[in-house]
Amino acid sequence: MGCLSVVGASPCVSSSALSSPTSRLSCAPSCKLILNPIKKNHHLAAFQPAVHLFASNQSRSHASKRNHTTRIFLPHLVASMEEVEETYIMIKPDGVQRGLVGEIISRFEKKGFKLTGLKLFHCPKELAEEHYKDLQSKPFFPKLIDYITSGPVVCMAWEGVGVVASARKLIGATNPLNAEPGTIRGDLAVQTGRNVVHGSDSPDNGKREIALWFGEGELCSWTPVQEPWLIE
C-alpha cells in the first residue's frame, strides 16, 4: 500500500494512512524494510554529519599544505639566489635604434645589480654565429644572424646575487606577447624576431658569453657605495 514516502532519512506518512488502523498495521513492516537500508547507507545522504565534513576538510588542508611547501622553489634557483653571479646582457639592434638603451640599463640599476662592463659594438658575423651556435640547426638561424649584425648592439656585463635568474625575470618571455607586463619585453616589444634584449640563461653561460664579448681590460672591478644596503 502507498502509505509511506521517504525524504532523506525521515519517513513521511500520508494523512490517509493515519486515518486507517488497518493501514497503520500493514505499514509497520514496510517501514522497517525502507528505513534499514537508509540507516545502513547513511553516508550517501545529502547532508553528512559535521564530524565527517570537518575530518575530510582537515585532511585536504594538510595535503594542500604539504604540496604547497614542497613546490615553492626549484633547487638550482634557490642555490643561485645565495651566490654572486655574472650575466651577459645585450641590447639588440632594434633596442638601440629605438632609443631604449637608457630605459633598459635603468631597470637593472634600479634592481640593484652592478654594471662591470659596457660598450657599443658592431657585431661581426663570426661572433654572432659563435654566440648563437646552439641554434645553428634552426631554420631561422640565418635570419637571426642578419638581425644581430644589422646594426650596433650594447654589450653589458652585470654582477649580483642571483643575477642570472633575476635578469631573466626582468627581461620576460622570449615571445613578447607572452611576456608579463612590467618586464622589458612585455613593455617594449611585440615580436620574437624583434625582442630588444638578450640575457644569459645560466651562470655558466653568463661567464662564457662575457668572455666571448669582452676582451682583456674591458671589465671594471669596483664596489658601489650602496652595496651594504643591497647585500647582507
UniProtKB/Swiss-Prot annotation:
Zinc recorded as keyword: no
Source organism of this protein record: Nicotiana tabacum (Common tobacco)
Catalytic activity: a 2'-deoxyribonucleoside 5'-diphosphate + ATP = a 2'-deoxyribonucleoside 5'-triphosphate + ADP; a ribonucleoside 5'-diphosphate + ATP = a ribonucleoside 5'-triphosphate + ADP
InterPro entries: NDK-like_dom, NDK-like_dom_sf, Nucleoside_diP_kinase, Nucleoside_diP_kinase_AS
Gene Ontology, cellular component aspect: chloroplast
Database matches in PANTHER family: NUCLEOSIDE DIPHOSPHATE KINASE
Protein name: Nucleoside diphosphate kinase 2, chloroplastic
BP terms from Gene Ontology: CTP biosynthetic process; GTP biosynthetic process; UTP biosynthetic process
Transit peptide start and end: 1-79
Co-factor(s): Mg(2+)
Enzyme Commission code: 2.7.4.6
GO MF term set: ATP binding; metal ion binding; nucleoside diphosphate kinase activity
Record-stated family: Belongs to the NDK family.
Top EC class of this enzyme: transferase
Alphabetical list of SUPFAM superfamilies matching this protein: Nucleoside diphosphate kinase, NDK
Keywords, comma-separated and alphabetical: ATP-binding, Chloroplast, Kinase, Magnesium, Metal-binding, Nucleotide metabolism, Nucleotide-binding, Phosphoprotein, Plastid, Transferase, Transit peptide
Residues engaged in binding ATP: K92, F140, R168, T174, R185, N195
PROSITE patterns the record matches: NDPK, NDPK_LIKE
Function: Major role in the synthesis of nucleoside triphosphates other than ATP. The ATP gamma phosphate is transferred to the NDP beta phosphate via a ping-pong mechanism, using a phosphorylated active-site intermediate.
Subcellular location: Plastid, Chloroplast
Active site: H198 (pros-phosphohistidine intermediate)
Pfam families xrefs: NDK
Kinase is among the record's keywords: yes
